[in-house]
Amino acid sequence: MANQLHRSRKVKIVATLGPSSDTSADIRAMFLAGADIFRLNLSHGDHSAVKRRHQIIRKLEKEFSRPICILADLQGPKLRCGDFHNGGVELCLGEKFTFDLNKNLGDKNRVCLPHPEIFQSAKKNHILLIDDGKVALKVTNKTSDVIECEVTSPGFVSDKKGVNCPDSILDLAPLTLKDKRDLDFVCDLGVDWIALSFVQRAKDIKEIKVLLNNRAGIISKIEKPSAVDVFDEILDQSDGIMVARGDLGVELPIEAVPPIQKRLVMMNTLRRYIHLNS
């Protein structure tokens, strides 16, 4: 047992807990198999489930007299389209499609996009991505409440699919009301790190710093091209970074992600900050 727990490796293993790894036996087995950090994903599960997992981890700490790091990952803002009459539509290459603020059910010509911030920042020739990039549309015209597009990558779009805006910096608060409630809850429990989603610029981190009041370290998740562009400034405000390769690969060419990851990790290492890859 002592040999299993003597871990001198520099690279640590982060294990995300969820429904399939939820019991005391599961978490214990993951710890003994080499997990150094347990990630609590606050996008899923209620506070009672988070509290139970937290208690299991802290009991393991006492049992083995070894500190175990807990990382709480905030959900962050989620951008989604509205619902359709028939649950979704097939968008074909070259077709015209419109996003608006009208809450009526969508059809083959339009759908509600209930995020005014996107209408404020979108410009002609900007790209909008739907469903993790499976469908792409180019902005051809826009007003304060309508965005007209042309389909450049066809596919099926269904109710409440995620929307990405790789060309835009959105005037969007990084913390939702849910995030603020979750933040207070996990800080009262006692966690080591908070991962902040949807970081676009350094000022996004300043709000959470005030709310945290030094109760945990801040990991900034790099998942937007705009965050890559101002990485130095983000790093100045953070205690560490997480390179979210899957999210970056939605908004950037997939072949661009590995060299970006390598560069960001190198910059981070020079400052001796913690860095995670997901």
Report each predicted region and the residues it spans.
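Non-catalytic helical/linker scaffolds that mediate oligomerization, partner binding
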Residues: 1-278
